[in-house]
Amino acid sequence: MEVLESGEQSVLQWDRKLSELSEPGETEALMYHTHFSELLDEFSQNVLGQLLNDPFLSEKSVSMEVEPSPTSPAPLIQAEHSYSLSEEPRAQSPFTHVAASDGFNDEEVESEKWYLSTEFPSATIKTEPITEEQPPGLVPSVTLTITAISTPFEKEESPLDMSAGGDSSCQTLIPKIKLEPHEVDQFLNFSPKEASVDQLHLPPTPPSSHSSDSEGSLSPNPRLHPFSLSQAHSPGRAMPRGPSALSTSPLLTAPHKLQGSGPLVLTEEEKRTLIAEGYPIPTKLPLTKSEEKALKKIRRKIKNKISAQESRRKKKEYMDSLEKKVESCSTENLELRKKVEVLENTNRTLLQQLQKLQTLVMGKVSRTCKLAGTQTGTCLMVVVLCFAVAFGSLFQGYGLYPSATKMALPSQHPLSEPYTASVVRSRNLLIYEEHSSLEESSSPASAGELGGWDRGSSLLRASSGLEALPEVDLPHFIISKETSLEKSVLLELQQHLVSSKLEGNETLKVVELERRVNATF
């Protein structure tokens, strides 16, 4: 036990030194020319504790000359606790930089070789990944630790290879590590000469190598991280970049607590699930195969439960967000509908106002057109009336018988002289029966008095004839003793009086009376 404890301390110290050597800042490390298969065999011989003794180490060079075939993987390791080897090989680059200043002295290398060559119990090398559990049959890959110390091993093992003899019978006892064929091809075809700082990124892990209970939250290109004291017994796997609810869940026991030996403390969820499934609750490490199988089963169930809860939570959040969006869209739709209704009402009122305005404009235009038409008609009627009045005044002087008026007007002057000069006619007219009163009232007088009386009596009779004689009977006053000239004039005047009673009735009466008076004298 003392040897075991001292070996564990050296391993811890060795891992600490390796974590210092694997700092990403030290890029000027040495490149190794050792093949990847040899490094892998060294790790399987030293770390897993399957070596027998030092003579086997001396014959290691003979066995490492044979390169494993990528297409024919080696058989699995058959150990008592094979569950500790149930991890997939990590797709990590085997090339790691080691600073030239951080070299080991011969004593440290010899002590480390002694602990590595010592056969440890299987419980001390039990390893399990921090974030995943893989199906059995695949050995863990801790190539980071191996490549970090590959140079001291080569320096120390070179004299051993020269001094030891080749025993081919020991090759059957060399444990082999099973790798995926494509991964082996990838690493074996990767030449150390082509290695550089930019090519240190690890290839993505194939999805076929994951088990059903794997988390699948690892980054496709994991980076190399330095070791810490808390991760001494776990392989150097890169931690996932994204947050994982399963790895940090309080319902599951941390993977590093399931390693090593000692009391085993499980979570309440794991205990409850084990009891519900009818499995016994393990209390100490290391676990047996049945206990490990049962624990893996219930851990898988718990992970599925956690993932289902997470998916339901995300679905609920998504549905809540969708409901909120639907509600906001519905409210917005209602508001838009109200706005559309308001706009429709406004448009309807504007159309009504436009129709009213159009009717008013059309009415005003029709009225103005009517007024203009009436004004034009009125002007035309006035012009026509003016022309009618003008032409009527021109033709009014001539009348229907213009010759009678022409003959009557100039005949007044020559007829007045014989009436005044001829006394015989006037005497003959005065002797007329009907005018006897005139003869009685008349008396012999001088010619001057007769003329004055003649003018005064003619005026009086003219005025009395206008008032007392509304109708004149010309044939009653015409005497057969008158001359033919007087008869023709009277006939024409009588016809003219009949035709124009309204216009020249008064003037004709005055002329007839004057002529009658003159004729009587």
From Swiss-Prot:
This protein's GO CC annotations: chromatin; endoplasmic reticulum; endoplasmic reticulum membrane; nucleus; perinuclear endoplasmic reticulum
Transmembrane segments: 379-399
Annotated crosslink Glycyl lysine isopeptide (Lys-Gly) (interchain with G-Cter in SUMO2) location: 178
UniProt keyword terms in alphabetical order: Activator, Developmental protein, DNA-binding, Endoplasmic reticulum, Glycoprotein, Isopeptide bond, Membrane, Nucleus, Phosphoprotein, Signal-anchor, Transcription, Transcription regulation, Transmembrane, Transmembrane helix, Ubl conjugation, Unfolded protein response
InterPro entries registered for this protein in UniProt: bZIP, bZIP_sf
Protein name: Cyclic AMP-responsive element-binding protein 3-like protein 2
Motif mapping: S1P recognition: 427-430
Superkingdom field: Eukaryota
Disordered as annotated region, ranges: 196-264
Organism: Rattus norvegicus (Rat)
Function recorded in the entry: Transcription factor involved in unfolded protein response (UPR). In the absence of endoplasmic reticulum (ER) stress, inserted into ER membranes, with N-terminal DNA-binding and transcription activation domains oriented toward the cytosolic face of the membrane. In response to ER stress, transported to the Golgi, where it is cleaved in a site-specific manner by resident proteases S1P/MBTPS1 and S2P/MBTPS2. The released N-terminal cytosolic domain is translocated to the nucleus to effect transcription of specific target genes.
Predominant cellular place of this UniProt entry's protein: endoplasmic reticulum
Location of the region described as Basic motif in the Swiss-Prot/TrEMBL record: 296-325
Membrane protein topology class: Single-pass type II membrane protein
GO molecular function, one term: DNA-binding transcription activator activity, RNA polymerase II-specific
Domain bZIP residue range list: 294-357
A Pfam family hit: bZIP_1
Post-translational modification: Upon ER stress, translocated to the Golgi apparatus, where it is processed by regulated intramembrane proteolysis (RIP) to release the cytosol-facing N-terminal transcription factor domain. The cleavage is performed sequentially by site-1 and site-2 proteases (S1P/MBTPS1 and S2P/MBTPS2). N-glycosylated.
